[in-house]
Amino acid sequence: MALSTSRAINHIMKPLSAAVCATRRLSSDSTATITVETSLPFTSHNIDPPSRSVETSPKELMTFFKDMTEMRRMEIAADSLYKAKLIRGFCHLYDGQEAVAVGMEAAITKKDCIITAYRDHCIFLGRGGTLVEAFAELMGRRDGCSRGKGGSMHFYKKESGFYGGHGIVGAQVPLGIGLAFAQKYKKEDYVTFAMYGDGAANQGQLFEALNMAALWDLPAILVCENNHYGMGTAEWRAAKSPAYYKRGDYVPGLRVDGMDVFAVKQACTFAKQHALKNGPIILEMDTYRYHGHSMSDPGSTYRTRDEISGVRQERDPVERIRSLILAHNIATEAELKDIEKENRKVVDEAIAKAKESPMPDPSELFTNVYVKGFGVEAYGADRKELRATLP
């Protein structure tokens, strides 16, 4: 498997700029330029790859660390809430994949659109959603981002260009192509990131949507988050050709180390520039989820604990940023631990506030069901009692 080969490589990013290797604390100048090299080269299909050299700053490094550790703490807390039966139904966690959400967000604006599948909590947070909105939604409360009606799989923040959160495998991709069509129709200089997993990569509708995007040169970026397992099925057992970045054939693609936030940032910056001028491109993010597929999956029956711990030790996205911050004397280990401690506190406070939010009124069952204006009648289970006329 390709993942085991990549594990043998030392993936820690290498600092290139001698000027910033001085022992002085760079935090005194948060805008100082630091040049880093991506952990691995980009592998490309029908396109010249971007440079491996990426510019950053102490401020951005610290922001990445804070954002990724906050996302991870949120997902760990969600795990505990689910086990305490405060979250019901489906719940898919994102810990391990944080570099994709954070790196992508660093390359785009809130006018660009993102649409994804059901592993959506961290994408929502990256788009500007709050922890209170996230936890309230997970617990089915009125103050949730979908008013407590969507749950884990249906987070939205339309005003920031986040269109969900979708529970049907692969069905979000055609919707994403529709968003890109609207952007081109309105002559906007923005793009849409349509995200899906390796488990959805064989869905027929994905190829149909990609063909349409290519035919009309739509500003669409298809992001395959390849965490190597579709539920419990390894990629090589489900796909004859698991090189998902080549799947478009006539559409260019890049394979990206999705555990390296700077590789993701560089690839997304490159992809946006390409899509605005030339149409769609595929980004395959080589990433890894630490939890099982969902809360009912222990995640250890189809992969070994050694495999999981090996990825944690050698490729963890948070530890990469921590190493880079320490190498450039931007912060001390104690200061980074203080940030993590503060994140823990912020998450705990958000959970407490979300618990105070009331449950939705039962009348909410009859809202947002049909397009307004049809006056559809809704009956009870016995079909005798008229419960409501839907607006």
From Swiss-Prot:
Residues annotated for Mg(2+) binding in this entry: 198, 227, 229
Record's keyword annotation contains Metal-binding: yes
Question: What is its subcellular localisation?
Answer: Mitochondrion matrix
**Disulphide linkage map:** none
Tell me where the transmembrane regions lie.
Answer: none
What EC number(s) would the UniProt record show? 1.2.4.1
Q: Which GO terms describe its molecular function?
A: metal ion binding; pyruvate dehydrogenase (acetyl-transferring) activity
The UniProt catalytic activity note for this protein reads:
N(6)-[(R)-lipoyl]-L-lysyl-[protein] + pyruvate + H(+) = N(6)-[(R)-S(8)-acetyldihydrolipoyl]-L-lysyl-[protein] + CO2
Q: What is this protein called?
A: Pyruvate dehydrogenase E1 component subunit alpha, mitochondrial
UniProt source species: Solanum tuberosum
